[in-house]
Amino acid sequence: MSRLACCAALGVVLIASCGKAPDAPDTEVTQGAELPAEAAQPVAGPEAVVEVPRHLEVTKDYFVGSASFDDALFDIAPDIAATLVEDARARLDAMDADALAYKAADPDYFNPYSLSIQWTLDAAAGDLISLEGFTAAYSGGAHGNYGTDARIYSLQTGQQVSLRTLLADPQGAMTESLPFVLSDIAQQRSEKAGGGASAETFRGETADAISADSILRGELGLVASTEAGRFGGFVVHFAPYEIGSYAEGAYKAVVPQSVFRDFLKPEYAGLFAGGPVTEE
C-alpha cells in the first residue's frame, strides 16, 4: 500500500545571513520543545476545541507565516491538537517580532522572513499516535532552511512518549535496525546522485554519520501498517546537513516492525504487525 505524507516539523535553527550585512537576530525553532504551562494550556474537552483554529496565517510586508494541522488530529486527540496550535502560534509571534526588530535595526540589509509549519497524523494504534511535522523557514540568509520532526503521544496522558519507552532492549533494537537504515539511506543517496556513485560507496559514507546511538537519539516516529489498527514500523528523520550537503536535503528511513519486533516490551508488541505503509 502507499500513502502520501505531507509532513512537517518544529525544529529548525534558522540560518543567519551570509552576506555583508550584520548578523540578524537568530530565531530558533527547537525540536521537541514544550511551551511553558502558562503559554500553552491544552484546551479541555471537545466543545472547547471547536474554537481552536485549524490554520494560522500571518501576512505582513516583513513576515509571512502559516501553520496547518491535520483535521484528523482534532478528532482523535483534541487536547494535543490544541497544544500544537498554541505552540505554533507562539513561534509565529516570536519570528514576527524578530523580523520586525531586524527590519527596524538594519532596513538596508533586511529581507522579509517566512515560516511555515505543518503537522500530520501519521499513524495510530491502541493508546498511541504518531505525528510527523515539517518546518520551512527563512531569516534573511543566502537560503532558507527546513527540517522534519516526529512525535509519539499517549492518548491517555497527552504526553510525548519516546520509542525507547516501547523497547525492552533499546540498544539491541537499534543495533539490529542500523544495517537496514544504512542501506536504505545509501540507496536514496545513490538515486539522488543519478548513479554518480554506487550505493555501497554511499553506505560507507553514511556509516560515518549514523550509529545505533544516533538513531536512538534522533527524530523517531511510528508508521502505519498494512494491517489496520497496527503500527508497521518506525521512521527516523535526518535533517539537511546531518548526513550530506544541504543540496542533498533531508532523509528518512522506515524500519519494518519485523526487524525490531523481538525487542519490544510485551505490553506493546500487540500494537505492531504487518508491513509499513510506504510513500509514493
Task: Describe the function of each predicted region.
Residues 19-280:
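Compositionally biased intrinsically disordered regions enriched in Thr/Gly
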Residues 1-7:
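Bacterial N-terminal signal peptides that target proteins for export
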